[in-house]
Amino acid sequence: MRLQAKKSDWTGARETLNAKLKAGHMPRDVHKRRDAVLALSAAKEIVDDGSSIEAREAAIEANRLSPDLIPAAVLAAQGYIAQGKPKYAARVLTKTWGVKPHPDLAAAFAAIAPDETPAARLKRFRVLTKQNPTDPETMMLMSELHIAAEDFPEAKRALGDLVTDDPTARSLTLMAAIERGSGADDAVVRGWLTRALTAPRGPQWICDNCQNIHS
């Protein structure tokens, strides 16, 4: 199966995977997860070839098989947006955010209405942020939305204690933006940015097939 994946023979790899499941050599949950990754890989290949209809179908299939797989959900949402079905895109992303918040999901959710005002975006995103409200990703997203709306005190409140309890490059960069927006000295802003340079990057996922790390 790995050889097939290396050759981008996603159909063959999925057939091998199904054979392993039927033979009892693989647990069903592992099969679902790996099949979703293969479907996602196929979707990316199709996107590169410019076959948008097939890409949407493959991406939606991948999302149904494994709703916690972030890239599949994003591709499925992009497919719905291209079809003029923004409500379906929002449902896919909201469901996935409820399983595992991730910045790529927020970016895809923003793309549903790219020209909205910061205030309108803050309101629309509430359907997303009410899922997993105490997750660090949700807290950072709320902070970003308030920064865009130039409500810096609320942006700082949204971050909570993340910069001390769970500092990442992103949360520290957000704190720098909050300080700058609040009128802090340049030295204070630089201090936060300096800390961000050496902080952990945040969530990543590892492809089961290519073993590459993706942010």
Predicted regions and their residues:
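Repeat-based scaffolding regions
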Residues: M1-S215
